[in-house]
């Protein structure tokens, strides 16, 4: 066990795979800026390490969800461009200016209030990306009239820079014409005013499924980490992505249950014969939810069923006789075609692979593998 963490479970993160996925999108869109999305702690895998690795391999512009996430990147030496995709409370707009962070303008009314917060003595620029709602029904303005009014406000302020405009696809990972309709609406609105430096509409699914000459940037989130946005996308593209995360643990205790004996809370599992069980130091506080009961983990190449209720910190599995304390357990595999893939876990949890990754708790150490070195990051002991 490493002296940088003191429990028998961790997440392997393959930084080489993440770089390879980034380069896949660079080849798919050779004349566009590929914007890695490192929000939610880099989809659970570590935004700082991911951003540094990608900067070393040519990334120039990152996207996050919140101003706090952007400032965290700045505090750790990430000096590339950063766009906050979410709405910043207007009273904190000067923090964005201070940290050289581009912000999203969702409406004219928001911008009017934000400008009031900028002191007349300010001499630094604020980069702005205007958000258009073309069908997601979430953030953004819906009309060309409001869009043009916002641009007029931006151009009327000496330190506001109209750097970008973007939208977000609602159904790019599903069959149908929704994405094309949204793209058409986006182009119609954007075409009614001067174009900024960055025009972007494609998320991971959009970037895999569609090319558009109208845009000059793509935002890549889930697929940066090696995961397809949906089974539909995976089956309809000829692009190979490399999953980058593997969740490892080990058996910390074994014991025999006799017929009639039960395990875990509620005693919902009762042995009907003599049964060997193993305990894994992983639970729902780590991102392995209670609904994983009945699923399996991989122990020495054998599929072992999760029995009883998953606890906060521990999980119990049924094991064959040869399994012993210290044997390696694969909770989530870094191969897409195995029973422990992120997609298989998502199916069991009735969710999507995005959420499986984002659920990975900060108390799980991350072990980063790259062509240069191996580095351990423990958020609890940093």
UniProtKB/Swiss-Prot annotation:
InterPro entries (UniProt xref): Ala_racemase (IPR000821), Ala_racemase/Decarboxylase_C (IPR009006), Ala_racemase_C (IPR011079), Ala_racemase_N (IPR001608), Ala_racemase_pyridoxalP-BS (IPR020622), PLP-binding_barrel (IPR029066)
Catalytic activity, EC: 5.1.1.1
CDD domains: PLPDE_III_AR
One cellular component (GO) term of this entry: cytosol
Pathway: Amino-acid biosynthesis; D-alanine biosynthesis; D-alanine from L-alanine: step 1/1
Reaction(s) catalysed by this chain's protein: L-alanine = D-alanine
PANTHER family attached to this UniProt entry: ALANINE RACEMASE (PTHR30511), ALANINE RACEMASE, CATABOLIC-RELATED (PTHR30511:SF0)
Name of the protein: Alanine racemase
Species of provenance: Staphylococcus saprophyticus subsp. saprophyticus (strain ATCC 15305 / DSM 20229 / NCIMB 8711 / NCTC 7292 / S-41)
């Amino acid at each position: 066990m490493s002296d940088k963490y003191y429990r028998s479970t961790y997440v392997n993160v393959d930084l080489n795979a993440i770089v390879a996925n980034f380069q896949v999108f660079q080849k798919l869109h050779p004349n566009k800026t590929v914007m890695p999305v490192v929000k939610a702690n880099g989809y659970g895998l570590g935004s700082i390490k991911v951003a540094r690795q990608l900067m070393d391999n040519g990334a120039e512009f990152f996207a996050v969800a919140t101003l706090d996430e952007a400032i965290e990147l700045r505090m750790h030496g990430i000096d590339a461009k950063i766009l906050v995709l979410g709405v910043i409370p207007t009273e904190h707009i000067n923090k964005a200016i201070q940290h050289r962070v581009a912000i999203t303008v969702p409406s004219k009314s928001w911008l009017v209030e934000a400008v009031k917060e900028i002191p007349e003595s300010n001499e630094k620029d604020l980069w702005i990306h205007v958000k258009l709602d073309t069908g997601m029904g979430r953030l953004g303005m819906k009309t060309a009239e409001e869009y043009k009014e916002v641009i007029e406000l931006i151009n009327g302020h000496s330190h506001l820079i109209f750097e970008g405009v973007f939208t977000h696809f609602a159904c790019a990972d599903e069959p149908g014409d929704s994405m094309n309709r949204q793209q058409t609406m986006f182009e119609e609105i954007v075409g009614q005013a001067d174009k900024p430096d960055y025009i972007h509409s494609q998320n991971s699914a959009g970037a895999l499924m569609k090319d558009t000459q109208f845009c000059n940037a793509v935002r890549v989130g889930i697929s940066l980490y090696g995961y397809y946005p949906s089974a539909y996308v995976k089956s309809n593209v000829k692009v190979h992505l490399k999953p980058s995360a593997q969740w490892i643990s080990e058996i910390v205790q074994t014991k025999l249950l006799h017929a009639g004996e039960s395990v875990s809370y509620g005693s919902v599992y009762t042995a009907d014969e003599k049964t060997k069980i193993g305990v894994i130091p992983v639970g729902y506080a780590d991102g392995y939810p209670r609904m994983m009961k009945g699923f399996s983990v991989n122990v020495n190449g054998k599929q072992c069923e999760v029995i009883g209720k998953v606890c906060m910190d521990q999980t119990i599995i049924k094991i064959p006789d040869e399994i012993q304390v210290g044997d390696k357990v694969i909770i989530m595999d870094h191969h897409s075609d195995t029973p422990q893939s992120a997609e298989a876990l998502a199916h069991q949890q009735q969710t999507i692979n995005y959420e499986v990754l984002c659920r990975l708790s900060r108390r799980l150490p991350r072990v980063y593998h790259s062509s240069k070195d191996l580095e351990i990051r423990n958020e609890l002991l940093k």
